[in-house]
Design a protein with these regions (language model features):
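Membrane-interfacial terminal anchoring regions of lipid-handling membrane enzymes
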Residues: 1-33, 43-46, 226-246
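Short acidic-hydrophobic, aromatic-tinged amphipathic segments that line or gate anion-handling sites
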Residues: 66, 123-126, 216
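Generic preference for hydrophobic
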Residues: 66, 79, 101, 208-210
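Catalytic core of membrane glycerolipid acyltransferases/transacylases, capturing the structured
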Residues: 27-46, 50, 58-59, 72-130
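Short gly/ser/thr-rich secondary-structure transition/capping motifs
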Residues: 59-66, 133-134, 190-192
Length: 246
């Protein structure tokens, strides 16, 4: 029995490596076929998320639970989630809707994986670069205007201990400027399943909890952004069983 866990993990790593080799050509082919009529690159993006979902389910000692439901209808959202681990990307790929991810540019430079992000229309950002931030916001607004949701981690980095970090305002300014609701998501278990800074996985129950959308309130822009930021963080903190400080 003791040999089964490392053997299963080794097999899962092999499947993951195989998926990372096979998927980019499939995403490229999908993009080539659909790009004339798919401005949002929804088909290519959805295929990439299926790869992420596949990877998240290859490891037998991860128990995945999706709680709550994505809201009905075709409304676009600024989707925000707490960030515990690199595993969050794979776990959130199990969600039923395509959305474009805002992620640090270094991820887009990873061979194969980064190419898929680019082909899928995800949005790279250079941290600390105001020009990059402005370009990201403009591109994200275009997606939202075409009915495509945009995914952001408002903490800006992964939490080392799984505790919620302060939220930056970018995602909430985007929602206010675009006039779209925020869809909060609470993640638990990924900090244990793949700790920050480690490529090795551990047994864990991975949970994604989809919370109720938070509408953009009335009032001056800066005040609306701050109210939205505070309310969304409060809801995610409550779902995680934490106090809403920060």
């Amino acid at each position: 029995v003791r040999l089964l866990v490392p053997a299963a993990a080794a097999f899962a790593y092999l499947l993951t490596a195989a998926a990372l080799v096979v998927w980019p050509p499939l995403v490229a082919l999908t993009l080539a076929v659909t790009w004339p009529f798919d401005r949002n690159r929804a088909a290519a993006g959805r295929l990439l998320r299926l790869c992420g979902a596949f990877v998240s389910r290859t490891f037998p000692f991860w128990r995945i639970r999706i709680e709550g439901r994505w809201p009905a209808g075709r409304q676009a959202y600024v989707v925000v989630a707490n960030h515990q681990s690199f595993l969050d990307i794979f776990l959130l790929s199990n969600l039923p809707r395509e959305m474009k991810w805002v992620a640090k540019r270094s991820l887009f430079k990873i061979p194969w994986v980064g190419w898929c992000f680019t082909m899928s229309g995800d949005i790279p950002v250079d941290r600390g670069d105001p020009a990059s931030a402005a370009a990201v916001m403009a591109r994200a607004r275009r997606y939202l205007s075409r009915g495509m949701s945009v995914m952001m981690f408002p903490e800006g980095t992964r939490s080392r201990d799984g505790k919620l970090l302060p939220f930056k305002v970018g995602a909430f300014k985007l929602a206010v400027d675009a006039g779209v609701p925020v869809l909060p998501i609470a993640i638990t278990g990924t900090a244990q399943g793949m700790p920050k800074g480690s490529p090795w996985v551990r047994p864990s129950e991975l949970r994604v909890r989809i919370l109720d959308p938070v509408p953009v309130g009335a009032g001056p822009g800066a005040e609306a952004v701050e109210r939205l930021r505070s309310e969304v963080r409060r809801r995610i903190a409550s779902a995680l069983g934490e106090r809403a400080e920060g």
